[in-house]
Amino acid sequence: MKKNNYEVRAQKFIQKVFPYIEEDMFNPYSVEKAIDKFNEDFHRSVKVHYGDARIAIITSDYVVKFDYDSESIEEIGGCEQEIELYEQAVEDGFDYLFAKTSRYDYEGYSFYIMPKINGIGQYKNIYHHADYYMTYEEKDWCDAHNLTDLHCNNYGFRKGKVCIVDYAFIEHEFEWEDEEY
C-alpha cells in the first residue's frame, strides 16, 4: 500500500506544477508569475519565497525547494547541503532540530521536499527566542557545522518543538552571544 504522506503529495504537486515553471525556473520572478497562474487554474493558494540561491514553493503542508543560483547548479547547492547536513544530524542525534529534507528528481531537475512548519511571525533569533533556548550542546553542534543564519524566517515550530527549515551552511566562523533577553 502506497503512503499518501506529504512527500508523496509533494511529488504529485511537482508533476502538476512543473509545466508552469519549467520555461524559466531559474528566475524567481518568472516562477512567482507561473505559480500565480497555477493558483488561478487550480484554485490553490500556493506561495513562493526566494533568497539568494533557492526558491521555495510553499503549500499548506509541505515546501518544495530548488536551487536557482548559477553557481549552485554547477556546484553543490544549498538544497543538497541541507540533505547532507540532515544526514549528519541523524548520525549525531540532532535530527530533532531540523525539518527532514528529501530529494525528488523529476524531468532532469532536483527538487527538495520538507514538511511545512508554523512560523513565528516576528523577527527573533533562535538563540535568544523567549519560548525556546538552545542548549550549549545544540549551539556547539550548529557552530561546528557553520549554521549561522538562524533567524525567524529560517526556523519555526512543529508540534510545539523548534524546527529549523533553512540550514544550508555558510563558510565562516560565528561567535555566540550569551546575552539575556
In which residue ranges do the predicted regions lie?
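Short, solvent-exposed coil/turn segments at beta-strand boundaries
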Residues: I58-V63, E107, P115-N118, H145, ...
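Active-site-adjacent loop/helix micro-motif of nuclease/hydrolase catalytic cores
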Residues: E71-I83, Q122-Y132, F174
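ATP-binding glycine-rich loop module of kinase domains
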Residues: R44-Q88
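Protein kinase catalytic-loop region centered on the HRD/HxD motif
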Residues: E138-H145
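Catalytic activation segment of kinase domains across protein kinase-like and atypical kinase folds
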Residues: N146-Y181
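Juxta-kinase regulatory segment immediately upstream of eukaryotic protein kinase catalytic domains
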Residues: K2-S45
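Short, surface-exposed coil-to-beta transition loops
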Residues: G51-D52, E107-Y109, L150-C152
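Conserved structural core of kinase catalytic domains
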Residues: Y68, E87-M134
